[in-house]
Swiss-Prot record:
One of its GO terms (cellular component) is secretory granule. This is Neuroendocrine protein 7B2. Acts as a molecular chaperone for PCSK2/PC2, preventing its premature activation in the regulated secretory pathway. Binds to inactive PCSK2 in the endoplasmic reticulum and facilitates its transport from there to later compartments of the secretory pathway where it is proteolytically matured and activated. Also required for cleavage of PCSK2 but does not appear to be involved in its folding. Plays a role in regulating pituitary hormone secretion. The C-terminal peptide inhibits PCSK2 in vitro. The modification Phosphoserine is found at S140, S204.
Amino acid sequence: MVSRMVSTMLSGLLFWLASGWTPAFAYSPRTPDRVSEADIQRLLHGVMEQLGIARPRVEYPAHQAMNLVGPQSIEGGAHEGLQHLGPFGNIPNIVAELTGDNIPKDFSEDQGYPDPPNPCPVGKTDDGCLENTPDTAEFSREFQLHQHLFDPEHDYPGLGKWNKKLLYEKMKGGERRKRRSVNPYLQGQRLDNVVAKKSVPHFSDEDKDPE
């Protein structure tokens, strides 16, 4: 019985479209001479709602948004599996893998890290990645400074590959750079003929006029 009603209504709809008739509730002022796809979708959605096939939408006005109580959740975000979008669920989504322009999709054995990060990723401990290093900002600054000054070809000619362990050993064995807490430009005798901006001029006793 239901299938007969659906076929009857669909045949009537096709007859309307073939005859060029436009229903009053599906009238579009932009295209008065032809029926748009949005009008067809609205008409089909109305038919499906009347037959109980489609679930009607529940929309809340803006002034009722603050009246919602209890936990609310939103479904259908990215990477939540295969979804069907659109008012009728006939638009399948595409689950794309998020990768950068220079980032390969898989890190196989032939695609190693040229400069492995810390802490070590899984399976990359033997590539020069450090495991037992201080997790402080000061060590990170010092390590990056030595990393730019480190020349493996000059310091270690037999080393054909970058190695963080040698740099770490060099940092622990060498003298630490002392921070300069005294401004060297403020030491020594001050010149009297140099006057700072917006300062009170100072005159020595020799420049005073004899009374």
